[in-house]
Amino acid sequence: MLDRKPLRRRRTLSCGIVVVLDSRELLLCHVTGQRQWDLPKGGIQSGETPCDAALRETHEETGLSLTPAALLDLGRHDYTASKDLHLFASLSERVDPRALECTSLFVDRRSGRSRPEMDGFGWFAFDRIGALCAPPLARLLGRAIDLERVVVELVAGRERLAA
């Protein structure tokens, strides 16, 4: 008798950046037409590294231009049944959310018009993640990633560079 293992579907990979302040807040983007807020993140393109994809997606979805040297690699995590999420973190100065702009567009099924993927931005305390984000992201940021530790590591790294 053949021992057949169930076929596992290939998981897609999204990459993004958790942009944090030393005041224990993070940047979230409001998803156009939805109630939830999200991180700047998206799919990896052929030939890109996870870091390249995270930087590109963050720039497209917020206008922020970050550098690889400013990133802390948080690794690849199970996100949904069919998707993994590779996250990085970056310590930022407070940017006025009204100055941010999403240039990544999608075609709205109802209107047929192109709309930005993200239509709002804000800085939110870590304890608001569960109320604002979709459950898979809230679970990931609440359990698998210790955002308090991330801020401590990023601040220590900034201080080492300044010394």
Locations of regions flagged by a protein language model:
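Active-site-adjacent beta-strand/loop module that shapes the phosphate/pyrophosphate-binding cleft
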Residues: H77-G112, G122-D127, L140-V151
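Conserved hydrophobic "DFG−1" position in protein kinase catalytic cores
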Residues: V19-V20, L28, S90, W123
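A short coil-to-beta-strand element that immediately follows conserved catalytic motifs
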Residues: S65-G75
